[in-house]
């Protein structure tokens, strides 16, 4: 009646490329103003908070990988990949220092101690660790949502589902 939008899901932008700097600036502006952006085929997937947090937490479970990054052992990685992984690890560390994430921190620390001395194989895969990770906050909260809400509100859950497909294959 008033002509004002009541649901941001009523808005759609169509661009030739979501990689264009102007499109990225618009997406950043909208998200800084608490308007979620959904772009299913963009490189933005790996820039999402929940994706970086998962990857950082997974890496913290394997301290030898982190040592390898710090020592420059992975010469096959491009500098931007090393920077990205470090960013994920720093985000995970920041998140784990928050008191509300104490249980997650304790669990990851336990796994890190187990994996640092690992000599053989385990009876679980990366995907198994990922699903266990989802039992802890903040991931449990991201996944405990009403699936009948708008697409922008379920993006973290959708991204975690997509990441579980990637890791599980």
Task: Label each region the model flagged.
Residues 1-73, 148:
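Conserved motor-region signature of P-loop NTPase helicases/translocases
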């Amino acid at each position: 009646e008033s002509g004002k939008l009541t649901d941001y899901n009523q808005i759609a932008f169509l661009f030739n490329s979501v990689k264009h700097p102007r499109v990225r600036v618009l997406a950043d502006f909208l998200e800084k103003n608490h308007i979620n952006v959904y772009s299913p085929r963009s490189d933005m997937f790996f820039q999402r908070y929940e994706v970086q947090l998962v990857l950082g937490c997974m890496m913290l479970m394997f301290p030898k990988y982190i040592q390898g990054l710090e020592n420059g052992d992975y010469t096959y990685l491009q500098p931007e990949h090393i920077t990205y992984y470090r960013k994920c690890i720093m985000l995970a560390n920041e998140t784990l220092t928050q008191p509300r994430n104490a249980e997650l921190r304790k669990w990851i620390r336990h796994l890190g101690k187990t994996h640092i001395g690992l000599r053989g194989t385990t009876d679980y895969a990366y995907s198994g660790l990922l699903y266990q990770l989802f039992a802890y906050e903040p991931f449990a909260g991201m996944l405990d949502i009403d699936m009948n809400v708008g697409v922008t509100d379920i993006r973290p859950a959708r991204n975690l589902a997509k990441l579980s497909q990637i890791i599980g294959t």
